[in-house]
Amino acid sequence: MTTHNEAWQSHFTGRPTPDLTLHPRHLSVVLDEAAGTAPRREALRFQNTRMTYAELREHAERFAAALRRNGVQPGDRVAIMLPNLPQTVVAFWGVMKAGATAVMTNPLYRETELTRHFRDAGVRVLITLDILWQHIGPLLETLALERVFVTSVDDALRPPLNWLYALKRW
């Protein structure tokens, strides 16, 4: 019988060597490379929405430009408080391309966790979901945010699902 360690170790040919050469680069280069080598390959899928690597890079670059127009500077900390949506991926890569730091934030956090998390990280800007506003709105002064970007689930959907989502919320 093969042990757990033997099973995965059989895939490795040797030990890592201390002379391993690392090539440090900015994380946003990874998206650029993926979009350059496989622009039409599907990068993400959500309900009836599909996005290629080229489209993801384009959305990320546009969002990065919007962040910069709204005062986000390299090194700023931007909280991304979203569930698993295409906007989460676009926001992350947009923050990277703007040179800022993404502070991934659990959308289930409430007042105590948000206040501690944002203060500890030095968050200046927030990207969140409209249905979370009821928890964020009352904390705006406490959190000392300079900007808040709000999106909706239906922003990630194509017809007819975006229409149905809007009707359901109404």
What residue spans do the PLM features occupy?
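Short low-complexity stretches enriched in small and charged residues
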Residues: M1-H4, I80-P83, A102-Y109
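Short N-terminal helix-initiation segments at or just after the protein's N-terminus
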Residues: L27, F92-G99
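Structural core segment of the AMP-binding/adenylate-forming
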Residues: R69-N70, K97-W170
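Flexible, non-catalytic linker and terminal segments flanking ANL/adenylate-forming cores
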Residues: M1-P24
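Residue-level signature of the cytosolic catalytic core of signaling kinases
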Residues: H23-L27, T128
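Conserved AMP-binding/adenylate-forming core of the ANL superfamily
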Residues: T21-H23, D32, R40-L85, V89-W93, ...
